[in-house]
Amino acid sequence: MGLSGGVASLFTYPYVRDADWFAAGVPPYGNLYEYQRKQDTMTDLPQSLPQAWRPPMGWNSWDSYGTTLTEDELLANARFMAEHLKNAGWDTLVIDIDWYDPTARAHGYNDNAPLILDEYGRQLPDPVRFPSAAGGKGFGPLAAAVHELGLKLGMHMMRGIPRIAVDKNLPVYGTNYTAKDVADLDHVCKWNPDNYGLNQSHPGAQAWYDAQLDLFASWGLDFLKVDDMQTPFHSDEIAAYHRAIAKAEYGRSIDLSLSPGGWVATSYVDFLRENAQMWRISDDLWDRWEDIYQQFARLARWAPFQTTGHWADADMVPFGHIGLRAERGDDRQSRLTLDEQKTLLALWCMGRSP
């Protein structure tokens, strides 16, 4: 369950589920309701918990800042989360799309954006918005600051390879291949112009993802939201990302979250469990009751398939201060009424959505 508003978005203990939830065996570590009631902390749980043992919870920048989040804004939310929400299970901050675009703006994407890339075409943070990334440091310093607070850092990524890398025919790290060798110019995102697809029948395509994930893992990344994966369903790209994450050798597990969802068929559940920790089951959800209402049917379909380590995701929680520089709408407090917000939280908890 991901908050998407600014630091004013506060909800304590929304992860507590009822006795039936625990009786179903998720999670398999006893009654956390009683644990929470007695201990009022999440810090003493067993150290051997499996990856994504409960639905991941945290904050995502999209609904408030769109493509334009800054380092200072991320750290302000991180400090607030550490002080007020961490002990209730909220522990991950996710930098959403276009952190590598120095011309990023509210309300849309830029054609032919001058993306910041390394010599192998891998994305690097805009050092103006993220000053600690200057000098090729990437998100390493920011991840260290977030980890120091006892939290995790995640980020968004589009599937495929940057068009700029293909136009310049940059080399694929560790191989004799180039970006033009591995690009798939026919399978591109319909709504974001940054990337081409990857030709997964070419061995250099896996090498591209391996090199990209090796870089991201070296920064200390904990969570990766990969977009344009499920509508249509790109099984070869999903599997390639999963393999790349498994190969990254920096001692940290990385949760893979797939987005967006559309109307994902439950027949994909075994494949999704094999390759990801989370997968969206809808398109973007905003602060409109009609968006929330549609999630009842989606979560009803997916609830029987929820299991430790692998979660169907009903999308972020659009509460609090949103729209500051977002894709949709203007600066506002969530338009959902208090009753609608309570209903959303109840539905997400019953459906065990991240």
Predicted regions and their residues:
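Aromatic-lined carbohydrate-binding/catalytic grooves of carbohydrate-active enzymes
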Residues: 73, 77, 81-223, 228, ...
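Carbohydrate-recognition beta-sandwich/jelly-roll modules
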Residues: 1-84
